[in-house]
Amino acid sequence: MALERTLSIIKPDAVAKNLIGAIYNRFESAGLRIVGAKMMHLSKEQAEGFYAEHKERPFFGALVEFMTSGPIVVQVLEGEDAVRKNRDIMGATNPAEALAGTIRADYAETIDENAVHGSDATESAAREISYFFSDEEVCQRTR
């Protein structure tokens, strides 16, 4: 299986609850390496650009408002089958449907404020990583 990279975002609700370390522990315990990370407060324009594919959806305005409501932590995760592994760790989008032991089951309260975002495919991961990180900001891990 090939080494992959995926984008992960710890959303404002989880940052506000001081869950960054707990979520990072989940990534690392699953064998994912954090090869790029930054904390930032998205502008409205940044959030609209990142979620542009949802622009015509009824939840778009609320999503942009939520994602700009406080700081987020954005990271690049690397590992074998990283996209699927991260999605398994996150759990279902709706925390009420997420399996016990997943990030969303343990830390999220609603489908709108669901703690984390993760790329859904290797193609979207590449696009999402480049939205937040330059090549120089992603480290090569050798150990």
Swiss-Prot record:
EC annotation from Swiss-Prot or TrEMBL: 2.7.4.6
Protein name: Nucleoside diphosphate kinase
One of the GO BP terms on file: UTP biosynthetic process
Domain of life of the organism encoding this protein: Bacteria
Keyword NADP tagged: no
Localisation: Cytoplasm
Signal peptide as annotated in the record: none
Any GO CC annotation of this UniProt entry: cytoplasm
Main location: cytoplasm
Annotated positions binding ATP: 11, 59, 87, 93, 104, 114
PANTHER family registered for this protein in UniProt: NUCLEOSIDE DIPHOSPHATE KINASE
Family: Belongs to the NDK family.
